[in-house]
């Protein structure tokens, strides 16, 4: 079925018809994970270009994908680093697509939603959610020097 409008899917399990991709370019390597860096979002950027070009993205709701997660990725330090780099990636994509102010406003809105959600959760879960949002914001609002 078509992927819901207004959302961009993740790229963990995707397939394309090569002929249908002409004119959209490939994945932007500056947004990919290279040399241990956790910058990401090349698939989000690519999906965004497809949607802007009028393409429909399809998905299989019942598909199952298994992840093997090494212990090093289950630490608080990794979680903070990953969350920070999610913010950096969001900023890079917002700069590419010239929507940085809109992305900043959206992040502030997400803070409001996060605080409301935290009021409904056990304190331990709330702390993890707040850590994630804080690190994403730090990455998003920090200008990266090239």
Regions found by a protein language model. Name each.
Residues 81-88, 95-146:
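Non-catalytic, C-terminal membrane-associated alpha-helical segments of glycosyltransferases
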Residues 1-7, 11:
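Short, flexible, basic/aromatic active-site loop/helix in glycosyltransferases
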Residues 1-2, 24, 75:
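General structural signal for secondary-structure boundaries
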Residues 33-39, 66-89, 95:
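Nucleotide-sugar-dependent glycosyltransferase catalytic core
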Residues 11-25, 30-63:
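A short, conserved alpha-helix in the catalytic core of glycosyltransferases
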């Amino acid at each position: 079925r078509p992927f819901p409008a207004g959302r961009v899917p993740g790229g963990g399990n995707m397939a394309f018809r090569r002929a249908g991709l002409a004119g959209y370019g490939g994945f932007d390597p500056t947004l990919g994970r290279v040399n241990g860096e956790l910058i990401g979002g090349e698939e989000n950027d690519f999906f965004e270009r497809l949607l802007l070009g009028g393409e429909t993205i399809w998905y299989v709701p019942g598909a199952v994908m298994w992840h093997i997660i090494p212990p090093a990725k289950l630490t608080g330090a990794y979680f903070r680093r990953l969350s920070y780099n999610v913010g950096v990636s969001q900023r890079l994509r917002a700069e590419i697509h010239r929507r940085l102010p809109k992305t900043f406003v959206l992040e502030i809105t997400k803070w409001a939603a996060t605080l409301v959600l935290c009021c409904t959760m056990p304190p331990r879960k709330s702390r993890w959610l707040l850590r994630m949002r804080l690190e994403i914001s730090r990455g998003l609002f920090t200008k990266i020097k090239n």
